[in-house]
Amino acid sequence: MTQLFDTLGFIETSAVRAGAAARDAHGAHQEAATRADVAAVSLVHVGKVFATPRGHAAALRDVTFDVRRGEVFGIIGRSGAGKSTLLRLVNGLERPSSGSVRVQGVDVGALDEDGLVALRRRTGMVFQHFNLLSAKTVFENVALPLKIAGVPKAERTRKVDALLDLVGLAAKRDAYPASLSGGQKQRVGIARALVHDPEVLLCDEATSALDPETTQSILALLADINRRLGLTIVLITHEMEVIRAVCDTVAVIEQGELVETGPVWRVFGDPRHGATRALLSTLVHDLPAELAARVQPLPEQAALPDGAQVVLDVRYTGESGGEPDVGALAAALGGSVRFLHGGIERIQGHAQGRLVIAASPGQSLAHGGAVAALLERARRHANHAEVLGYV
């Protein structure tokens, strides 16, 4: 019920005719103003502290990043990491305890109530829960913010019908929420968020209540809206699959801190923080249990058993921009080469992935030297390579 009131309150305040926005606060950092000139959303050294019965709790600490105009920017982190707090700072539902938040160059923390109303008209919001009014039709739910704002009926009808067509719900115009699927309800929510032609669309776990197939359809819709309208989208999620499917850039939040950010292909191909690697663990080609049980540690001194092969973990980050030349890798390793596990995929045009292979070290070198030579040859044809053991 609280979430429903939050949604209705957001719609109502967004629909009131905006007054003049307050001027930027005196003494704003030059860094913030400069960054905001080229960014749709800019956070500079942002901190947020909440008072609790046990004292003050820091939800965010020194967070700095920019969202470029027209991109889809994903914020990911585990539950309680501070993702939702970040989104509430962007639309002015919370004010930062330190630092600055700017949307289209406007300092959100310096706005008065009229300025916040103007901001929310330019910043659409898609909520995790659909929060539709059950007694109103699809058309009426989408038209409600326009009706509150006093938009003439003919203009409301034209605008809402166009939006329902955009989100694929023209045939459900006169249906009631009870007859809609979860994905259709979220499409209504997306249409409602677009009624004021926002410059930025914020999505708060917009797919977390949906099944995988419906999630993909909603993500495809958001990507289509981004392309067709040139709309900047900021979404928060705890699912790396969502980031991979639709985002251009990702920021990883862990315990209120920004621990990693960059293009999605780079972060996925070469994660540099433990929190990122943990979030990616569900997408990584981990060794199946039966294969892991077969891999034995290399003996420190003794030779490998006859016929044994060294197991190499070869990784491609996509940094080179080309496709992995698996044939060249096999030729460089020489002898018998077997592919045991893994795969290659493309993210933002970059081929990346992991191959677990078994290769013969050869007999021309002592045991340690042969393995080192094999590893060196593998590294010439991949971004990373390491020895897992032997089979």
Swiss-Prot record:
- Source taxon at top rank: Bacteria
Where does the record place the ABC transporter domain?
44-280
Query: What are the boundaries of the signal sequence?
Result: none
Does the UniProt entry include the keyword ATP-binding? yes
Q: Which GO terms describe its molecular function?
A: ABC-type D-methionine transporter activity; ATP binding; ATP hydrolysis activity
Provide GO CC annotations from the record. plasma membrane
- Keywords, alphabetical: Amino-acid transport, ATP-binding, Cell inner membrane, Cell membrane, Membrane, Nucleotide-binding, Translocase, Transport
- Which CDD domains does this entry report, sorted A to Z? ABC_MetN_methionine_transporter
InterPro entries linked: AAA+_ATPase, ABC_transporter-like_ATP-bd, ABC_transporter-like_CS, ACT-like_dom_sf, MetN_ABC, MetN_ABC_transporter-like, NIL_domain, P-loop_NTPase
Assigned EC number: 7.4.2.11
Membrane-topology annotation of the record? Peripheral membrane protein
Which reaction does this enzyme catalyse, per its entry?
A: L-methionine(out) + ATP + H2O = L-methionine(in) + ADP + phosphate + H(+); D-methionine(out) + ATP + H2O = D-methionine(in) + ADP + phosphate + H(+)
| UniProt-listed SUPFAM superfamilies | ACT-like, P-loop containing nucleoside triphosphate hydrolases
Give me the residues that bind ATP, please.
Answer: G77, R78, S79, G80, A81, G82, K83, S84
Question: What biological function has been recorded for the protein in this entry?
Answer: Part of the ABC transporter complex MetNIQ involved in methionine import. Responsible for energy coupling to the transport system.
UniProt record similarity statement: Belongs to the ABC transporter superfamily. Methionine importer (TC 3.A.1.24) family.
Q: How does it assemble?
A: The complex is composed of two ATP-binding proteins (MetN), two transmembrane proteins (MetI) and a solute-binding protein (MetQ).
- Put simply, this protein is called Methionine import ATP-binding protein MetN 2
User: Gene name?
Assistant: metN2
